Every structure is written in structure tokens, then in C-alpha cells.
UniProtKB/Swiss-Prot annotation:
Organism classification: Bacteria, Pseudomonadati, Pseudomonadota, Gammaproteobacteria, Pseudomonadales
Subcellular location: Cytoplasm
Family assignment from sequence similarity: Belongs to the AccA family.
GO cellular component, as recorded: acetyl-CoA carboxylase complex
Name by which UniProt lists this protein: Acetyl-coenzyme A carboxylase carboxyl transferase subunit alpha
Catalytic activity: N(6)-carboxybiotinyl-L-lysyl-[protein] + acetyl-CoA = N(6)-biotinyl-L-lysyl-[protein] + malonyl-CoA
Pfam families: ACCA
Length: 315
């Protein structure tokens, strides 16, 4: 199967394969088959709109994990200028599962922090598949406190299955690192905007997700546990993951309806991986607009608004 397509996209993949075959035939024989290619392209677009207009929660969860989906560094490259990555937590080491540094958005200095997964096997291992250890969260905390000190807004990108549950992480007090970040972010006297770009997994996501404005990409997810994990607990089998995904309400639209998410950012047709540059442009537009809005509040108003936002969850 074409790695650019998931199994429920197979009809689209078949049409795209036919289009590529026709292009090759046309190149080899100098035949004018442009009309047929255009017809198939229109058919592919219509089919894509039909499939993506009716995705289940489980299908959206799989889209959030798509191996071609843009990651934090992809968005940094396409949204910001003059990015200067900063390293280390000043306690133990540098965690490559969290990237962060100073950049400019519309000429304004900002602190950008996000989870980073990895493409190839070696990079996946180096970045621990996007699952931070305590030093990753402590690095993020250090950068956020730096941002407050220099009056820079904080922009975070969330994309993790969850915090790393290994013994070494627990020995270095993973839960304390996450809890400390929640405490610090709730009190930071600078605007914070968080955007879920893929998986928003449990406390590992929330540790850089306390904010004044929460965005989710159209095909991202945000939940306290993975659908497979939930299914394993409730039904004793991960095969019930589709049912768990539906019951948990993990999608952007469901969470927007609950008042947890402020803005659902549309993705290009077929998902952000089909057109990463266009996806980045949509995020950039929203970030610029939200930063301008948050600048209208002084520090006391910002903190009061953030507190009210957090206390409204579950009401």
C-alpha cells in the first residue's frame, strides 16, 4: 500500500495511481491525454471530499498519527523566521523529544516549544517517538520562564502519544516535572497559545498545553489516554479502539463543542501532509490573529482570564 494513504483512503490511492500511469503513458507516447487526467483528478477530489467529510473518530485518530504528517520542526520552518534552537534543562540533559527556541513571527520575538517525533528509524529513536522524559519538560519550563523574563509570547505545538513511561523517567520524577509545568504555565505573565498538530496524549500533552488560547488542527486528537489504552482497560482488548475513540470524544469538533478548544484550524483537503505549506499558512494566520487579540490584555487580566478558562472545564 502507498504509505501516503491509509486503508480507508484506498479508493483515492487507486485513482492517484491511474493518474500517474496516464502521465507516464503520455510522456512516453506524446499522446494528449490531458482531458482524461483532468477528469480523474476531479473524480479524485470529489471522492476525497466524500471520504473526509464522514471520518469516524478512529479514522481521525489514525490521521493524527499519519507518518507523513508535519511535525513541529516542519511548522517552525514554514511559519517562523530566525529560529534559534535552545538545548538542555540545566539539571540532567537535553531531551530531543522536545524542541524549543526563540524565533520571530511577523517580526515579533516569540518562544516556540513543541514535541518532535521523527521520520526515519534513527531519528525516531533519538527523539523517543515524541515521548518526552522529565528533562524534556524541564527544558520546556526553562524556556517558558525565559520567555516571561524577556516578555516574549509562548507558542507551543502539541504532538505526543504521551510522556515516556519508562523506569528511568520515573526515577527522575516524571509526574513532578509535568505537575511543575502545569503550575508554572498557569502563572506565567505572558500570552500562551497552544496548538495540537497531531496526537495530544494525556499529561504528556498537557505539560505544554496550559494556555490562553487552545487550537486543534482538524484531524488532530486530544485525550487522557489512547483509544487502544482505553479499550484495553474497559474491554480487555485493543481491538475495541474504534469504539473507545468514539466514546471518548477525542476529536477537535467534539472538544470545541465542550468548550475545551477555542479554535479548530482547517487542514488542506486530505490532511496537512498533503500540503504542509498550506497547512502552515493556516496556522500562521490564526497565531497572528490570536496574538494580536491577547496583547490587548494586561498581565492581571491575562492571568484572570486564564484562571477562569481552566476553572470552566467540566462545567
Amino acid at each position: 500500500m502507498n504509505p501516503n494513504f491509509l486503508d480507508f483512503e484506498q479508493p483515492i490511492a487507486d485513482l492517484q495511481a491511474k493518474i500517474e500511469e496516464l502521465r507516464l503513458v503520455g510522456n512516453d507516447n506524446s499522446l494528449n491525454i490531458g482531458d482524461e487526467i483532468s477528469r480523474l483528478q476531479d473524480k479524485s477530489k470529489t471522492l476525497t471530499e466524500s471520504i473526509f467529510g464522514n471520518l469516524t473518530s478512529w479514522q481521525i485518530a489514525r490521521m493524527a498519527r499519519h507518518p507523513r504528517r508535519p511535525y513541529t520542526l516542519d511548522y517552525i520552518e514554514n511559519i517562523f523566521t530566525e529560529f534559534d534552537e535552545l538545548h538542555g534543562d540545566r539539571h540532567f540533559s537535553d531531551d530531543a523529544a522536545i524542541v524549543g527556541g526563540i524565533a520571530r513571527l511577523d517580526g515579533q520575538p516569540v518562544m516556540v516549544i513543541g514535541h518532535q517525533k521523527g521520520r526515519e528509524v534513527r531519528e525516531k529513536v533519538r527523539r523517543n517517538f515524541g515521548m518526552p522524559r522529565p528533562e524534556g519538560y524541564r527544558k520546556a519550563c526553562r524556556l517558558m520562564e525565559m520567555a516571561e523574563r524577556f516578555k516574549m509570547p509562548i507558542l507551543t505545538f502539541i504532538d505526543t502519544p504521551g510522556a515516556y513511561p519508562g523506569i528511568d523517567a520515573e526515577e527522575r520524577n516524571q509526574s513532578e516535572a509535568i505537575a511543575w509545568n502545569l503550575r508554572v504555565m498557569a502563572r506565567l505573565k505572558t500570552p500562551i497559545i497552544a496548538t495540537v498538530i497531531g496526537e495530544g496524549g494525556s499529561g504528556g500533552a498537557l505539560a505544554i498545553g496550559v494556555c490562553d488560547q487552545l487550537n486543534m488542527l482538524q484531524y488532530s486528537t486530544y485525550a487522557v489516554i489512547s483509544p487502544e489504552g482505553c479499550a484495553s482497560i474497559l474491554w480487555k482488548t485493543a481491538e475495541k479502539a474504534p469504539d473507545a475513540a468514539e466514546a471518548m470524544g477525542i476529536t477537535a469538533d467534539r472538544l470545541k463543542g465542550l468548550g475545551i478548544v477555542d479554535k479548530v484550524i482547517a487542514e488542506p483537503l486530505g490532511g496537512a501532509h498533503r500540503d504542509p505549506v498550506a497547512a502552515a499558512a493556516l496556522i500562521r494566520e490564526e497565531l497572528s490573529s490570536q496574538l494580536a487579540m491577547l496583547k490587548e490584555f494586561d498581565n492581571d487580566e491575562l492571568l484572570a482570564r486564564r484562571y477562569d478558562r481552566l476553572m470552566s472545564y467540566g462545567l
